[in-house]
A protein has these predicted regions:
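Conserved class I S-adenosyl-L-methionine
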Residues: 135-145, 162, 259-288
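Conserved SAM/SAH-binding beta-strand->alpha-helix loop
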Residues: 167
C-alpha cells in the first residue's frame, strides 16, 4: 500500500463507517510502500484491524469470514516450479478450488496483459470516448480484476488512481505488475495442461496507481472523493448491483463521471435473482430487459446518461481451442 495513496484518500473504517483508519503497524516496507502491515480503526469503540498483504490492504467488513473463504488466495505459493504445480493440479483434479482459481486468473491476465487485441482495453477506450471531457481529480477502478485498466485510467487523466476488487488472487497479479513490472501466470492450454507465462510489462503511470481489496458495495472512501469511476463488466458480477451503484454515486463528486460496461450475464452464483437488473419477470412492463432497468437505476442514483453504445464485442480466451464472446452495453454517465 502506497503511503501517498493512503494519505490522499484517507480511508474510513467499513465497520463503524465513522472513523478514519490509521497505519498501526508497518511490518515490511520498500521505499514509500507498505508490503505487510496493519491498518486500525481510530474509533475506540470499534478498533477493527485490517491486514496489508503483498502490498494490498484488505478493507472488508466481515474480515473473519472473508479470510476463511479466501485462505487459498491469501496463502497460495508463487514459487513452485511449473512441473510441481502441474503435478499438484493433476492430483487435485478438474473443478478443484486450485484449478478453478488458476483458470479464472489466467483468463483475465491473458486479456489484460498478453493478448495483442485486449478486449477490456478496447471497452475502456470506448467508454472514455463516450464520456468526453471529464473533471480533474482522483479516479477509482471498481472491479479492476488484474489491473491493466487501472494503469490506463491513471495515464489518461494523470491523476492518482486506485483499483479495487474483492478477488485477492487477481489483485496479487495487479500488485506484482505494479511493483515488479512483471506478470507471471498459468495460461491454460487444454484440460489440466497449463503453460507458465512470465512476461515483462511496460505500464504507464505506475507512480499514480495502487490496488486495494474492497467490497464494491461497501467502499472505504469518504463521500465525493473521486472525479472518475469505472465499472467495466462488474454490475452482473456483484451480489447487490443497487448497493454497488449507490456506493459509486456516494464516492463520486458532483459532475464526476462513471464508465460502465456490462453484458448482463446474470448468474445466481454471483448475484441472487432478486438483485438482477432485468433478466427475469418477462411478464412485466420491461419484459425482462436489463438495459432500461440499469438506465432507470442510474437516474435514481443521481446520474445523467451522457452517451451509450450497445453490442460492443468482448472476447475472453478460455484455452487454446475455446473462447467466450459477449455483446456489451457501454454507458458514460455524469453525477448531477
Amino acid at each position: 500500500m502506497k503511503r501517498a495513496h493512503f494519505a490522499t484518500l484517507q480511508p474510513r473504517c467499513v465497520v463503524c463507517h465513522e472513523a478514519p483508519l490509521a497505519i498501526t503497524s508497518a511490518i515490511r516496507e520498500r521505499d514509500d510502500d507498505i508490503l505487510e502491515g496493519i491498518l486500525g480503526c481510530t474509533n475506540d469503540k470499534c478498533q477493527r484491524e485490517y491486514p496489508i498483504v503483498d502490498g494490498i490492504p484488505i478493507l472488508v467488513a466481515a474480515i473473519r469470514g472473508w479470510l476463511n473463504a479466501n485462505a487459498l488466495q491469501i496463502l497460495k505459493r508463487d514459487d513452485l516450479s511449473p512441473e510441481i504445480e502441474s503435478l499438484i493440479g493433476d492430483a487435485l483434479g478438474a473443478n478443484s478450488s486450485f484449478d478453478t482459481l488458476r483458470q479464472h486468473v489466467g483468463i483475465y491476465t491473458y486479456d489484460h496483459y498478453e493478448s495483442k487485441e485486449s478486449a477490456v482495453l478496447a471497452l475502456l477506450d470506448a467508454a472514455l470516448s463516450l464520456a468526453g471531457d471529464v473533471p480533474g481529480g482522483a479516479a477509482v477502478d471498481i472491479g479492476c480484476s488484474v489491473g491493466r485498466t487501472t494503469f490506463d485510467i491513471a495515464a489518461r487523466f494523470a491523476q492518482l488512481t486506485v483499483g479495487v476488487d474483492l478477488n485477492f488472487a487477481m489483485l496479487r497479479v495487479a500488485s506484482h505488475a505494479l511493483r515488479e513490472g512483471r506478470v507471471s501466470y498459468a495460461r491454460r492450454r487444454v484440460g489440466l495442461a497449463y503453460d507458465r507465462s512470465d512476461i515483462e510489462v511496460d505500464l504507464p503511470a505506475r507512480e499514480l496507481v495502487d490496488f486495494w481489496c474492497c467490497d464494491a458495495g461497501l467502499l472505504p472512501f469518504r463521500d465525493a472523493t473521486f472525479a472518475v469511476a469505472s465499472m467495466l463488466n462488474v454490475i452482473d458480477c456483484v451480489a447487490a448491483p443497487r448497493d454497488t451503484l449507490a456506493e459509486c454515486s456516494r464516492v463520486l463528486r458532483d459532475g464526476g463521471n462513471v464508465l460502465i460496461a456490462t453484458p448482463y450475464d446474470w448468474a445466481p452464483t454471483a448475484t441472487p435473482v432478486e438483485q438482477w437488473l432485468g433478466g427475469h419477470s418477462q411478464r412485466s412492463a420491461l419484459r425482462g430487459a436489463s438495459e432500461p432497468a440499469l438506465q432507470a437505476l442510474l437516474r435514481e442514483m443521481k446520474f445523467e446518461i451522457v452517451a451509450e453504445r450497445d453490442q460492443l464485442p468482448w472476447r475472453l480466451r478460455l484455452h487454446d481451442r475455446s473462447a467466450v464472446d459477449y455483446s456489451v452495453h457501454v454507458i458514460a454517465a455524469r453525477r448531477t
